[in-house]
């Protein structure tokens, strides 16, 4: 019996220190640490979710935000069905880099129909906030993205963020079932991964991603 109906590859991008790893750990393992080590290269988590009686396996790639790792992480855009852009609501520069750096990388390396989601993290730091929600919503609308505010620390909207993009991917693949594939990825081809543990980990998941062709990148 099949363990899941769909397998989607999602990558998480954004500046270093925005809480990408914390969001992923909160979602995948329900854990949080104030002293989590910055990702070196690329790491990943796998989690299965149930949406509308459909079992969806998510392989979520956590990428390093430092400039020196961008050559490594750019290769993981290829074949991604969804991309989550994360900024820190208390760090204006991390927000500016969404349009100045990360969305440009998406245009350069990802497929044109990739599903995108913008997350404003660390909303628990109310007194330190410098990026307003309306400003972020405007950027999201201009770039065909949905927007969610979250806090990995308090677990606010974390599951909602990941299930939102998972549902959008599921809805699109069921809406266009007969379209030709544009993004079929065999995970065995990406088995060697540089992770934040400083070693080459082996991804044992060898299934092929569901074949999809999306008409729009927005998660609706």
Swiss-Prot record:
Topology versus the membrane: Lipid-anchor
Alphabetical GO biological process terms: protein transport
Domain of life of the source: Eukaryota
Residue window of motif Effector region: 36-44
Molecular function via GO: GTP binding; GTPase activity
Gene3D superfamilies reported in the protein's UniProt record: P-loop containing nucleotide triphosphate hydrolases
Lipid-anchored residues (S-geranylgeranyl cysteine): 219
Chief subcellular location: membrane
GO cellular component, as recorded: plasma membrane
Location(s) in or outside the cell: Cell membrane
Keywords for the protein's UniProt record, in alphabetical order: Cell membrane, GTP-binding, Lipoprotein, Membrane, Nucleotide-binding, Prenylation, Protein transport, Transport
Short name of any one Pfam family annotated for the protein: Ras
Annotated positions binding GTP: 14-21, 62-66, 121-124
Family: Belongs to the small GTPase superfamily. Rab family.
Function as written in the Swiss-Prot or TrEMBL entry: Protein transport. Probably involved in vesicular traffic from ER to Golgi.
Name of this chain's protein: Ras-related protein Rab-1
The species this protein was found in: Theileria annulata
